[in-house]
From Swiss-Prot:
Ranges of compositional bias, category Basic residues: 241-251
Highest taxon listed in the record's lineage: Viruses
CDD domains in UniProt: F-box_SF
Protein name: Putative F-box protein L166
Taxonomic source organism: Acanthamoeba polyphaga mimivirus
Region entry Disordered, spans: 188-251
Length: 251
């Protein structure tokens, strides 16, 4: 019977090693007999030292990470990260199990003589998160009445996203108005002195009879008022002077 128990104690740890770390813990916590093997097997995953330092079998963890801010670094650490505010020197520390270290370029220049050659060194690039965006300044000034917003610059299809904010300066105000060329109004050309409204089929053209064979457009009373307001004659005097009551109608 004793031989069977000894055989059980030798074979069962070998079987447990094929399980994942999560399954190992679940299996060995099912009963007190199996819990005996909890410090007899190895754990493959990487664990934080601050969460397992109270255990008596920390040497059973194959990978243990630690972030150091001073020289007090445990000897069981395998993955070491030096904090930005790390003070001290690695020359006073011993790392029998260290396989990986992460530090800045300045920290590496200070402690490179104390790092063994068989250790993997990770030095992050501080400029890897920066990127340059090139753009044509001429496109920016093409539409000066727009404000550069987000990813849109100008009215052209330079970017797909068209986020437009109108400028509140005086240029945008006068740009959006229908500006009248008063110089031309003061000395109008002969062909521009008379502006006639369009002639509809229901109306007479120079007192000529309307051809009733053509289809006539029936308009409502509101539509007739609309046409009367927007298509009335604009009277411009012939004395080359702008009338006082001049007004430009627009839709």
């Amino acid at each position: 019977m004793d031989n069977i128990c000894e055989l059980f104690d030798e074979i069962l740890p070998l079987i447990i090693e094929y399980l994942s770390d999560h399954d190992k813990v679940k299996f060995m916590t099912t009963c007190s007999r199996l819990y005996y093997f909890i410090d007899k097997v190895y754990y493959e995953n990487i664990y934080d030292y601050n969460k397992i330092y109270h255990l008596e079998f920390t040497e059973r963890f194959k990978r243990i990470r630690f972030c150091a801010i001073n020289e007090s670094i445990p000897s069981v650490i395998t993955d070491l990260t030096l904090d930005r505010e790390f003070t001290g020197s690695l020359g006073n520390c011993k790392f029998p199990r260290l396989t990986y270290i992460k530090l800045s370029q300045s920290q590496y220049d200070t402690n490179k003589n104390y790092i063994p050659s068989n250790i993997e060194i990770d030095i992050p690039n501080p400029f890897k998160n920066f990127h340059l965006t090139e753009f044509d300044m001429s496109k920016l000034f093409d539409d000066s009445y727009y404000i550069f917003s987000g990813t849109y610059m100008g009215s052209s299809s330079w970017y797909s996203t068209k986020t437009i904010l109108r400028s509140r300066n005086f240029l945008s105000y006068y740009w959006n108005l229908d500006i009248v060329n008063y110089d031309r109004l003061e000395s109008p050309e002969p062909e521009s002195q008379e502006n006639f409204r369009p002639i509809f089929p229901t109306e007479s053209n120079n007192n000529k009879p309307v051809n009733k064979s053509q289809p006539q457009i029936k308009k409502s009373r509101s539509q007739k008022k609309f046409d009367k307001f927007y298509y009335q004659k604009k009277i411009v005097s012939n004395n080359n002077k702008r009338p006082k009551s001049f007004m430009k109608y627009r839709r």
